[in-house]
Amino acid sequence: MKYNNHDKIRDFIIIEAYMFRFKKKVKPEVDMTIKEFILLTYLFHQQENTLPFKKIVSDLCYKQSDLVQHIKVLVKHSYISKVRSKIDERNTYISISEEQREKIAERVTLFDQIIKQFNLADQSESQMIPKDSKEFLNLMMYTMYFKNIIKKHLTLSFVEFTILAIITSQNKNIVLLKDLIETIHHKYPQTVRALNNLKKQGYLIKERSTEDERKILIHMNDAQQDHAEQLLAQVNQLLADKNHLHLVFE
């Protein structure tokens, strides 16, 4: 799939598809959420014994409320400790002892192994896929950051944006709903809801085939095609701008 030669968009969607497959495969097999693995990876590679909670929120693209919940779990299982500043009790810090750092290191090593084993089974040929937990963290934050960019600049969800990118890459800009579902790497209800939203906003046309009413066609007219191309070019430029690149670790 060419995505109309928008290389950064192609890379972005490849990464997101990889993350989707990874979560679907790994989530049932481990006793820790992916977010908790990522949080431990972040804390491990910071190599600091005390970190302000505000810095963690700033570096990671998760909602603050989500981070609070995951930190509670990690505190409960003695991976980290949470302390309040003696100067200002409103400021919270995450503290890590040497014993806890060793415990975290074991989990990060396990995460590295999980990623390598998944990559062997997945057999993706893309150069974008992460080789270890540190790269996984960076790519996860990269995709989350740009999902926010897309939502802010285009007022589209990531699924809606992906649908536009896929349809404009097809010959004659026509795709079967069945093929779109298989390509997009998102849940069926989520994809259909996004399609209906795009149709309602006038981005595309969704109709039954006149040759076979069991088939649903998704396509665009010339004006819709031009508008979608402009949006894709805008996002591709944002993705190519190094100033927008959100990496936790260089």
UniProtKB/Swiss-Prot annotation:
The gene is sarS. Transcriptional regulator that controls expression of some virulence factors in a cell density-dependent manner. It is found in: Cytoplasm. It comes from Staphylococcus aureus (strain MRSA252). This is HTH-type transcriptional regulator SarS. SUPFAM superfamilies: Winged helix' DNA-binding domain. The keyword Protein transport does not apply. GO terms for biological process: response to stress. Belongs to the SarA family. Its main location: cytoplasm. Keywords: Activator, Cytoplasm, DNA-binding, Repeat, Repressor, Transcription, Transcription regulation, Virulence. It comes from the Bacteria.
